[in-house]
UniProtKB/Swiss-Prot annotation:
Active site: 148
Coiled coil: none
Entries under HAMAP family matching the protein: ArgC_type1 (MF_00150)
Cystine connections: none
Catalytic reaction equation(s): N-acetyl-L-glutamate 5-semialdehyde + phosphate + NADP(+) = N-acetyl-L-glutamyl 5-phosphate + NADPH + H(+)
GO MF, any single term: NADP+ binding
SUPFAM superfamilies: Glyceraldehyde-3-phosphate dehydrogenase-like, C-terminal domain, NAD(P)-binding Rossmann-fold domains
Official protein name in the record: N-acetyl-gamma-glutamyl-phosphate reductase
Native source species: Leptospira interrogans serogroup Icterohaemorrhagiae serovar Lai (strain 56601)
Entries under PROSITE patterns matching the protein: ARGC
Principal location class: cytoplasm
Enzyme nomenclature, EC number: 1.2.1.38
């Protein structure tokens, strides 16, 4: 059993983490923090979350996690300093922010709009997509949990296997997200449900922080020479879920059955589902699950891949629990499958 401390447990991802941990018995949540909710109990804040112990929210600086694994679900600027502090104290750390994902400091600081004072810790972090980095995650003490959009793009491309070598270095991604995947906790941010009801729009065009993340990890796993990524996120009038449409081009038309390639690549992956047609991929099938659904269609040398996931589960808290299971030697599906 692993003891878990969750910093930032009062946010959207923090709540999802609490729900997931409440459904299993091998990991024990021992500390939860939220500066805004300090002094309140879980049952007061989230009555739908049931734990044997009615934990009390504390302020970040008031906890001493002892031997626990620390999950950081806090703002980017807080993670910059918190991750090294807990690592230096001997804790395993999973960071759900984006500040330890990119290996180019200039690009990281540009997209995250901050000065990264602990960049020397970047190479210590394992990028937390289990289907790609499973062996490294089993021995990791520091995991940088991937972005939700990034997961929906990097993983489908990775599953193309050797065909990735024939891709042209230009990737066009059109992603639609519910408000919880786009900063939906601030009422006046333009990302609240009342702002998007009966509405639909693009945001952060050519400036979203997941664009360089997609570029870096598609490059590192595919061998594409610094691929150009054109990523456009859109805001849907729904609460949760991401659907991504990825347009790829091959140097020449592949003759293989691409659905079969995806099926073979994901044969032993418990959270990857390959659907026969891209029209079958939809949000309702993945909401409240850790599944990533994928399908595709080819016309000559053009390939359109469609993927869907729940941004709060496979795109955040669920993938974090999957990583925790690997880091602690637990069954990978613990708390994520019935």
């Amino acid at each position: 059993m692993a003891e878990i401390s969750i910093l930032g447990a009062g946010g959207l991802t923090g709540k999802e983490l609490l729900l997931l941990f409440s459904r299993q018995k091998e990991h024990e949540v021992v500390h939860i923090t939220s500066d805004k909710l300090a002094g309140k109990t879980i049952s007061e804040v989230f009555p739908e979350v049931s734990f044997p112990k009615n934990l009390v929210f504390k302020k970040h600086e008031d906890i001493v996690p002892l031997k626990s694994l620390v999950v950081l679900a806090v703002p980017n600027e807080v993670s910059v300093e918190s991750a090294p502090k807990f690592l230096d104290a001997g804790h395993k750390v999973i960071d759900l922010s984006g500040v330890y994902r990119l290996h180019n400091q200039e690009i990281l600081e540009k997209y995250y709009k901050l000065k990264h004072t602990r960049f020397n810790y970047i190479n210590r972090a394992v990028f937390g997509i289990p289907e790609i980095f499973r062996d490294q995650l089993k021995n990791a003490d520091f995991v940088s949990n991937p972005g939700c959009f990034s997961t929906s793009v990097i993983l489908p491309i990775f599953l193309l296997g050797q065909l990735r070598k024939n891709l042209r270095p230009r990737i066009i991604v059109d992603s639609k997200s519910g408000v919880s995947g786009a900063g939906g906790r601030t009422e006046d941010s333009g990302y609240s449900y009342t702002s998007v009801y009966e509405n639909f729009r693009a945001y952060k065009i050519l400036s979203h922080q997941h664009e360089p993340e997609i570029r870096e990890y598609v490059y590192s796993k595919s061998g594409l020479s610094d691929p150009e990524v054109i990523f456009t996120p859109h805001l849907l009038p729904v609460y949760r879920g991401i659907l991504s449409t990825i347009v790829l081009e091959f140097d020449s038309e592949p003759e293989q059955d691409l659905i079969s390639i995806l099926e073979n690549s994901s044969l032993n992956e418990p959270f990857i589902r390959i659907l026969k047609t891209p029209e079958e991929v939809e949000l309702k099938k993945v909401q409240h699950t850790n599944f990533l659904d994928i399908s595709l269609r080819k016309r000559e040398n053009t390939l359109v891949v469609v993927s869907a996931l729940d941004n709060l589960v496979k795109g955040a808290a669920g993938q974090a629990l999957q990583n925790i299971n690997l880091m602690t030697g637990a069954k990978e599906t613990l708390g994520l499958l019935p």
